[in-house]
Amino acid sequence: MADKQIERTLIILKPDAVVRGLMGEIISRFEKRGLKIVGMKMIWIDRKLAEKHYAEHKGKPFFEPLIDYITKAPSVVMVVEGRYAISVVRKMAGATDPKDAEPGSIRGDYGLDVGDAIYNVIHASDSPESAEREINLYFKPEELFEYCKAADWFYHTHARSKKEYLDSMDCLER
């Protein structure tokens, strides 16, 4: 990731995305946008991990309902990489409250407001610092992978061919 515009960010497909069967549709959106999944797993977030993740919200009125929500069923956690990944993913996710999220955003299309709670299907890191902290909460370094996507060479402006790109990325040696 020598290019400073290339970032990694954490995404959580929350329990409602999992139990509603929305995982594939949501993951597909990130891939279609050109983001590369470098780590992904399904986990059941326990209370201890949830409290670490949402520590900045401790003491706020929505803290306990948030912890209950994120620990209610399995989640999919993933790390994606790409140019300006943090802001791209945040924009794709949409406003936190589904009623404020634009149609076409993930929360605008799939989030639910059921009166006493909102189910917004996705978490996305909000800054480089948060992304680093959150990635380290959920992934060990050996669970994140460097690889070349087949189409990367096409967009790589310095390479004149796929072979030149792959050679520069050391992909053929792996």
Swiss-Prot record:
Keywords, sorted A to Z: ATP-binding, Cytoplasm, Kinase, Magnesium, Metal-binding, Nucleotide metabolism, Nucleotide-binding, Phosphoprotein, Transferase
Cofactor (UniProt): Mg(2+)
GO CC term, one of those recorded: cytoplasm
Record-linked InterPro entries: NDK-like_dom (IPR034907), NDK-like_dom_sf (IPR036850), Nucleoside_diP_kinase (IPR001564), Nucleoside_diP_kinase_AS (IPR023005)
Subcellular location: Cytoplasm
One GO process term, biological-process aspect: GTP biosynthetic process
Binding, ATP: 14, 62, 90, 96, 107
HAMAP family the UniProt entry points to: NDP_kinase
Family to which the UniProt record says this protein belongs: Belongs to the NDK family.
Protein name: Nucleoside diphosphate kinase
Gene that encodes the chain: ndk
